[in-house]
From Swiss-Prot:
Belongs to the RNA polymerase beta' chain family. Binds 1 Mg(2+) ion per subunit. This is DNA-directed RNA polymerase subunit beta'. The RNAP catalytic core consists of 2 alpha, 1 beta, 1 beta' and 1 omega subunit. When a sigma factor is associated with the core the holoenzyme is formed, which can initiate transcription.
């Protein structure tokens, strides 16, 4: 252990391997106690000494002052261990007052409020009595029959006091035993035979049929089994002894004015002691029963208040009310509780904070530290140096010297901070880049200087932000800070692997200006240069300008030569002096050619250049390059003199024309609406669309006008800022010089009158009011959503914190097939982007040449992605954290590349926390960003057609087509897809075409780019006839199932189907349209069913009774709701909903099997029955109930596949998991979550979401227990079930069958194996109650548990230390060799050193195995 102490291991935190929790028995409480307390006195009011025998008694709890007894007879260390014969106090350190406990012997037992009131009540469950009855026994004086002896009463029957007296009179005093209060409950609990109850419940469970009863029995059975297995006795839930906390944990402090400030706990203890003593005295006097009962009830209430005051029934003691006293539970719960305030977050010594200012002349690894701060922070270091050099003899003088700021002090400070990294942190620390290490540079002034490039990582700006400084003290801490946390080592973002140290704002503007090129009038103006020094000379003499067009002889290098030596050749290129200046700072590498920067560079290009430099030249080159890029950018941004005035906002001349055109169209819509051709919501949607189009057109024209190059004034300044990506965006420019456009109401609806003015013209009063209306919502949202997002991050971290990389390869061959992501026909995420940095699960071949591209188990890096791209593959099977088979964590290969480094993740990396931060961090940013567009409605025009984006061949899937009377092809299938194939036959795009769309192409037809393939009405859902015939109304009765709805503004009436169930005569109606032929016979459709069209509530009928219709005609239409704007405020709740795995409010029904749709003849409680008839006759049909008024998206006779939706709405993720399995669930969740983030332009790697999903899928539900002890419907940890099943198979018994279940992140965090982690998360009292009666053990696997008990976390450097610690506990002499670096890298990280692993997996006694 000596060696371990060197490595920062404290003996107390290391001296145990697990933590167990159980209910304290009266004996164990007495054993822990140092004496009983009977007196309530605290301190003497005159001498302020603590009273003997009181709540602070020194005889029981230990001396108040170090090594000094109360009376003062013994003082000095030499008397340690002596007990003073005068005052009875043991002479020892006063620290024992923090650990010695006392106790109170209760005269009458009381119930422990946690086991009584925490739902489900454990006492109630064991006794099988409702909580109300138990409360009546405890508080209201009801009696319970313990033993009926010779009376007809039954055991456990609760009788009132009057009934008790009556029974005594009837049957005699001793003919039965009935008690009241806690004694009665205790007596019942003592008499319980848990094993018998267990056996009976299992028998009962076999025979019961009711689901409710089953659940109740299972709950009770679990509690009984937990009691049996944990060794707790039920009667311990009733207290006969109460422990008293050590006095220094409930101190008595005197304030300045001499009044004492007392901890609330002391108040509770005084009440209990007073009531207990009073009850003791009363019992000796033999008073009336009512007095005793009252006194006992008061004692019970006092103890309840001590343990948990919030659970008490009367109001004066609710938290927050005057006179509320904090109970023990309150000290653990919530943000201010022990767990979150003191154990998970601690205040740190050697720290300071100050305002930050920009330090443009710093290097990337430096930060400016004010001298004053440095002097204070490094004071102890300076003191020791001053003493060491003999400048001062004592520390006291050294302090004085530092105070007077003598010159020697500054010299020593310089020496001390040399190469001593410091940590800078900016709150809120949303991801790991919120704390980074820098080398301090001493500066004058009082503000910390920060390097401009790290601002985006900290999310810092210089408008008054503050940052905190921390000093790593120990050598190991300095080492970790320098190697892992230095700002130069954090160039890539851990969430998406793109550089985060990228220029922004002014720097981008400077570089953009540097790479601009003037347009020349004639070829004669272009000058030739052969050397860069000539260019500089010409610039100096003002012969050329930075942006002038010149010709230059550029020397190129050819690296691919036969002899391996690079060869050089020259080439004349057209460029500008500015670009040549930029070229001078580039590092030399074959991937970095001049063509990269021989163009105008905007933010996007600059980012990709930094990325390329990192991938090609490595880290140190990138850091130098970034620093040079920054200084260039700043220099030329200031030289350019870019500024803008009002005239720079050019309003396009076409604006009035576009606005007039839109107004005309809107008048047309109004006329159509008044003529009854379109409904109100259709008109609204069309108006919104028209104005959106108009705004976009004006914006386009404005961008055209503003981006025109003018010889005199060169480029427009505003355009340069927006185009370069330095500041502002197209949408902000649109509002400045175009037209503000549509605004949203706080409810999210769009106001249909747009703001036609822009900010340059100024808004009129009406427009101004409209815009404040939406903008105010943005501000309110921000405030509310920040809290929501922070809470989401907290839950994510909690659920993922114990996911650590534990081994290199778990040897699995499972994985997911990954395809590119297509939304609305466009590829939003290409395949190469998604598979980069993943590991192939199977060998990947080129389909044409059959060349092996990637071996199974190999990392797919940039080079391999390029090969896959060339091969034209549309799917690749890769390994995923979801399919990883590692125990207690995941393996490096299933995770793939560590995005922050660009190589396979190292063992011990805390990937769970990184995933949680990556998903949570943008949430906070996005919510703060809602109002940046000023509340203008950001809504794309609804897609209503499908256009070919490339020349391709059309393939139609599931297309059931009819021709209407105009010869148009109408799609009748619900699952029609148009697939576009390239010349080789590879699928390039796949689109869903909705039911009722018009198709303009045939199967196998070749289409040209921009050709229209199909179009449809996005605002209504039609119902279309398949055959020609005559319409007949069935069950469509005026006033019952249809109403003429008169539109007041138009005077035209529509026939709308209403809820017929609300009408008396409507009970058995099934409103539908029937198609008949001329002989009144119902027409049969192609699938052999009759032509019945069932009409949902809210549909508008387009046909009259008896009207003749043609195939392909629309007979009814269902209007869709007007679309609300979607921003992350819609998005964040969506992300939360998905991660919490909540069932959507009106979720779509998913088909469980393949089969044909059949509509039931009757209704079930106003729900419509749908049957899916399976293809094979051996299976029975599955029935579904669709709520009334919901539109089913299938017709009678349609064939549906397993997993297809039967009605509108979002599917329930639980259904997807149950029907289609884990891979389909993962695809659904990832695409839904990514969609929300993509809307905001945030990139998150899929693997982060997969890790969170892995944590949500840890539990399984047992549906056949086999020979195991599990119960049907029980949720158990998957690893545990697999282990149990393995044992069962070995013993030749039948294993349990189970299905995976999806838990929300909150549920999953609370159900974790570690009760310490769960208790510190939420519902602390409930978690601890549950853990205590189950006798749970916490093996301290996760990060949180280890932080709480004060150990190194088992991740990163701590992961290695844990392995070494295990070996050292085995007392092996040779474990020191594991400190050898090369050995450590190869053996520990690759996990291939058999000897090492065998050593660990031997029988290690009480050692936890990782």
């Amino acid at each position: 252990m000596k060696m371990l102490d060197l490595y920062g291991y404290t003996s107390i935190a290391q001296s145990f391997d697990k933590i167990c929790i159980s209910i304290a028995s009266p004996e164990s409480i007495r054993a822990m106690s140092y004496g009983e307390i009977k007196d309530i006195s605290t301190t003497n009011y005159r001498t302020f000494k603590v009273e003997k025998g009181g709540l602070f008694c020194p005889k029981i709890f230990g001396p108040v002052n170090d090594d000094e007894c109360l009376c003062g007879k013994y003082r000095k260390k030499r008397y340690r261990g002596v007990v003073c014969e005068k005052c009875g106090v043991e002479v020892t350190s006063s620290k024992v007052r923090r650990e010695r406990m006392g106790h109170i012997e209760l005269v009458s037992p009381v119930a422990h409020v946690w086991f009584l009131k925490s739902l489900p009540s454990r006492i109630g469950a064991l006794l099988d009595m409702p909580l109300k009855l138990i409360e009546n026994i405890l508080y209201s004086g009801d009696f319970v029959v313990i033993d009926p002896i010779a009376t007809p009463l039954s055991k456990g029957e609760v009788i009132s006091e009057s009934a008790y007296n009556q029974a005594k009179d009837n049957y005699g005093e001793d003919s039965f035993l009935a008690l009241t209060g806690a004694e009665a409950i205790r007596e019942l609990l003592v008499r319980l035979d848990l094993h018998a109850i267990n056996a009976n419940l299992r028998v009962e469970l076999e025979s019961t049929t009711s689901e409710m009863k089953r659940k109740k029995i299972v709950k009770r059975l679990r509690i009984v089994e937990n009691f049996i297995n944990s060794g707790n006795k039920p009667e311990w839930m009733i207290l006969t002894v109460i422990p008293i906390l050590p006095p220094d944990l409930r101190p008595l402090v005197s304030l300045e004015n001499g009044r004492p400030a007392v901890s609330d706990l002391n108040h509770h203890y005084r009440t209990i002691i007073n009531r207990n003593n009073r009850l003791g005295k009363l019992l000796k006097l033999n008073p009336p029963a009512i007095m005793i009962r009252n006194e006992k009830r008061m004692l019970q209430e006092a103890v309840d208040a001590l343990f948990d005051s919030t659970r008490r029934s009367y109001v004066s003691n609710k938290a927050g009310s005057v006179g509320y006293k904090k109970s023990l539970s309150d000290m653990l719960k919530g943000k201010q509780g022990r767990f979150r305030q003191n154990l998970l977050g601690k205040r740190v010594d050697y720290s300071g904070r100050s305002v930050i200012v920009v330090g443009p002349n710093l290097k990337l690894h430096q930060c400016g530290l004010p001298k004053k701060m440095a002097l204070e922070l490094f004071k102890p270091f300076i003191c020791s140096k001053l003493k060491m050099y003999g400048i001062v003899p004592t520390v006291k003088l050294a302090n004085k010297m530092i105070q007077n700021e003598k010159p020697e002090v500054w010299d020593i400070l310089d020496e001390v901070i040399h190469e001593h990294p410091i940590l800078l942190n900016r709150a809120p620390t949303l991801h790991r880049l919120g704390i980074q290490a820098f080398d301090p540079v001493l500066i004058e002034g009082k503000a910390i200087q920060l390097h401009p490039l790290v601002c985006s990582a900290f999310n810092a700006d210089f408008d008054g932000d503050q940052m905190a400084v921390h000093i790593p003290l120990s050598l190991e801490a300095q080492l970790e800070a320098r190697i892992l946390m230095m700002s130069t080592n954090n160039i890539l973002s851990p969430s998406n692997g793109k550089p985060i140290i990228v220029p922004s704002k002014d720097i981008v503007l400077g570089i953009y200006y540097l790479t601009l090129q003037d347009q020349v009038q004639s070829e004669d103006e272009i000058l030739f240069f052969g050397d860069f020094s000539h260019v500089e000379y010409a610039l100096h003499n003002k012969d050329v300008h930075l942006c002038s067009q010149i010709k230059y002889r550029m020397t190129y290098c050819n690296y691919d030569t036969s002899d391996g030596k690079p060869s050089y050749y020259s080439k004349i290129i057209e460029t500008t002096p500015g670009r040549l200046i930029l070229w001078q700072i580039f590092p030399q590498h074959k991937n970095l050619t001049f063509d990269l920067i021989n163009q105008v560079l905007t933010v996007k290009e600059i980012t990709s250049i930094v990325d390329l430099v990192y991938r090609s030249c490595g880290q140190s080159e990138t850091v130098e390059f970034s620093d040079k890029l920054m200084s260039l950018g700043f220099k030329y941004a200031s030289q350019s003199g870019i500024s803008f005035g009002c005239k720079d906002m050019i309003i396009p001349d076409t604006k009035t024309m576009h606005v007039d055109n839109a107004s005309e169209k809107i008048k047309e819509f109004a006329v159509q609406y008044q003529d009854g051709l379109i409904t109100r919501s259709e008109r609204y949607n069309k108006v919104i669309d028209e104005w959106s189009k108009c705004t976009d057109l004006i914006a386009k024209d404005m961008m055209k006008a503003i981006s025109v190059y003018d010889v005199e004034s060169k480029l427009n300044s505003i355009y340069m800022m927006a185009h370069s990506g330095a500041r502002g965006s197209a949408s902000q420019m649109k509002q400045l010089a175009g037209m503000r456009g549509l605004m949203a109401k706080p409810s999210g609806e769009i106001i249909e009158t747009p703001i036609i003015s822009n900010f340059r013209e100024g808004l009129n009063v009406f427009e101004y009011f409209n815009s404040t209306h939406g903008a105010r919502k943005g501000l309110a949202d921000t405030a509310l959503k920040t809290a929501n997002s922070g809470y989401l991050t907290r839950r994510l971290v909690d659920v993922a914190q114990d996911c650590i990389v534990v081994e290199y390869d778990c040897k699995t061959h499972n994985g997911f097939a990954i395809r590119s992501v297509v939304e609305g026909g466009t590829v939003v995420e290409t395949l190469d982007n998604i598979i980069l940095g993943r590991v192939a699960a199977v060998d990947v071949y080129n389909p044409i040449t059959e060349e092996l591209l990637v071996k199974a188990g190999e990392l797919i890096d940039e080079a391999k992605v390029e090969k896959i791209k060339i091969a034209g593959l549309d799917a690749v099977k890769v390994r995923s954290p979801l399919t990883c088979e590692a125990k207690k964590g995941i393996c490096a290969l299933c995770y793939g590349r560590d995005l922050a480094i660009g190589d396979v993740v190292s063992i011990g990396e805390a990937v769970g926390v990184i995933a949680a931060q990556s998903v949570g961090e943008p949430g906070t940013q996005l919510t703060m960003r809602t109002f940046h567009v000023g509340g203008t409605a950001m809504r794309g025009v609804e897609t209503s057609n499908l256009i070919a984006l490339l020349d391709a061949k059309v393939k139609l899937v599931n297309s059931n087509i009819v021709e209407d009377k105009h010869g148009n092809k109408i799609v009748m299938s619900r699952s029609c897809e148009v697939v576009l194939l390239d010349s080789v036959g590879n699928e390039k795009m796949r689109h869903n075409v909705p039911y009722g769309a018009r198709l303009y192409v045939d199967d196998g037809q070749l289409v040209k780019i921009t050709e229209k393939i199909a179009e449809w009405d996005p605002y209504t859902m039609p119902i279309i006839t398949e055959k020609t015939g005559i319409i007949k109304y069935m069950d469509l009765i005026d006033g019952v199932s249809i109403n003429e709805v008169l539109d007041e503004s138009t005077g035209i009436s529509n026939r709308v189907v209403v809820d017929w169930k609300l009408h008396l005569q409507g009970a058995n109606l099934r409103p539908r349209l029937v198609l008949i032929d001329d002989n009144d016979n119902i027409i049969t459709l192609s699938n052999g069913l009759e032509a019945n069209y069932f009409i949902p509530i809210g549909a508008v009928l387009n046909v009259q009774d008896g009207q003749k219709v043609h195939a392909g005609d629309v007979i009814t239409r269902i209007p869709r709701d007007s679309i609300k704007t979607r921003d992350i405020t819609g998005g964040l709740p969506r992300v939360i909903e998905l991660f919490e795995a909540r069932r959507p409010k009106e979720h779509a029904i998913v088909s469980d099997i393949d089969g044909y749709v059949e509509f039931g003849k009757d209704y079930y409680r106003s729900k419509r029955r749908i049957f899916i008839k399976p293809v094979s006759d051996t299976l029975s049909p599955v029935e579904y109930l669709v709520p009334k008024g919901k539109h089913t998206i299938v017709n009678e006779g349609d064939f549906v596949h397993k997993g297809d939706l039967l009605m509108d709405g979002d599917p329930d993720p639980h259904d997807i998991l149950r029907v289609l399995g884990v891979e389909a669930l993962a695809n659904y969740m990832i695409s839904e979550i990514q969609q929300v983030y993509r809307l905001q332009g945030v990139r998150i790697d899929n693997k982060h979401i997969e890790i969170i999903l892995r944590q949500m899928l840890q539990k399984v539900e047992i549906f056949e227990p086999g020979d195991t002890m599990y119960l049907v419907g029980e949720n158990i940890d998957m690893e545990e079930v697999i282990k149990t099943n393995d044992n069962m198979v070995k013993m030749g018994k039948s294993p349990a069958k189970y299905a995976p279940i999806l838990q929300g992140i909150t549920r999953a965090s609370l159900d974790t194996n570690s009760f310490v982690s769960a208790a510190s998360f939420q519902e602390t009292t409930k978690v601890l109650t549950e853990a205590a009666f189950s006798g749970k053990e916490d093996s301290l696997y996760g990060l949180k548990e280890n932080v709480i008990v004060g150990r190194l976390i088992p991740a990163g450097t701590g992961f290695l230390m844990n392995k070494i610690k295990k070996l050292s506990l085995l007392n092996k002499e040779d474990y020191s060799m594991y400190y050898n670096n090369e050995y450590q890298d190869s053996a520990l990280l690759q996990n291939d050193n058999n000897a090492f692993n065998q050593e660990l997996h031997k029988d290690t006694g009480n050692i936890v195995d990782y």
